[in-house]
């Protein structure tokens, strides 16, 4: 009986630690992530981004010569991938990101950490998912070009909502900024 009680305590303690070690995936971004985003937006000119669009999606490489900034970029990408994998919302006020979350299960994403940044390959499982992925690539490129200005505004989804409701999705002009409401 004592062995079972001890084993139960060990399991409870270990599961408690494993649960608390996971970042919160629901609700607002943790302060650490908000600080990373603010830092990357402020130092956007220190980030270099190259994107290759293809008929199945895209490949993007984002790098920096600053090791601390590269570490923040990697931490942010790792967190966002986990958040999207958990089906948690991202930027619920931004139509393009709402669309990304809706289509995320139709995207295959491969993340490769580099010494100076990250390389991300995204493949859409269908034509609409490809459009959504490429729109996201353009938006993130805008973040690296414009910094906070681009981060703070809404972005158009790749697929128009009215076309989606009618069952035939019509491509919208991707990644053009909208004024924040």
Regions found by a protein language model. Name each.
Residues 1-5:
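Positively charged n-region of N-terminal signal peptides that target proteins for export
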Residues 8-18:
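Bacterial N-terminal signal peptides
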Residues 23-44, 68-106, 140-158, 168:
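A low-complexity, Ser/Thr/Gly/Pro-enriched, surface-exposed linker/loop concept
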Residues 52-67, 116-121, 178:
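Terminal, regulation- and interaction-focused segments at domain boundaries
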Residues 57-58, 66-71, 79-81, 126-129:
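Primarily extracytoplasmic ectodomains and periplasmic/lumenal surface modules that are beta-strand-rich
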Residues 95-125:
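Short, solvent-exposed interaction modules
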Residues 113-150:
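Short, well-ordered, aromatic-rich surface patches in folded extracellular/luminal domains
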Residues 159-181:
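Compositionally biased, proline/threonine/alanine/serine-rich low-complexity intrinsically disordered stretches
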């Amino acid at each position: 009986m004592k062995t079972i009680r001890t084993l139960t305590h060990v399991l409870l303690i270990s599961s408690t630690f494993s649960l608390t070690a996971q970042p919160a995936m629901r609700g607002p971004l943790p302060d650490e992530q908000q600080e990373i985003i603010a830092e990357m937006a402020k130092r956007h000119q220190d980030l270099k981004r190259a994107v290759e669009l293809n008929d199945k999606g895209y490949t993007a490489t984002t790098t920096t010569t600053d090791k601390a900034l590269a570490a923040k970029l990697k931490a942010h990408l790792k967190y966002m991938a986990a958040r999207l994998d958990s089906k948690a919302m991202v930027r619920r006020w931004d139509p393009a990101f709402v669309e990304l979350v809706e289509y995320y299960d139709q995207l295959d994403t491969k993340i490769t950490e580099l010494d100076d940044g990250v390389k991300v390959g995204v493949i859409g499982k269908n034509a609409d998912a490809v459009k959504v992925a490429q729109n996201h690539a353009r938006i993130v490129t805008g973040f690296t070009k414009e910094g906070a200005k681009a981060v703070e505004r809404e972005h158009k989804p790749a697929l128009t909502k009215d076309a989606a409701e009618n069952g035939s999705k019509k491509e919208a002009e991707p990644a053009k900024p909208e004024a924040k409401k």
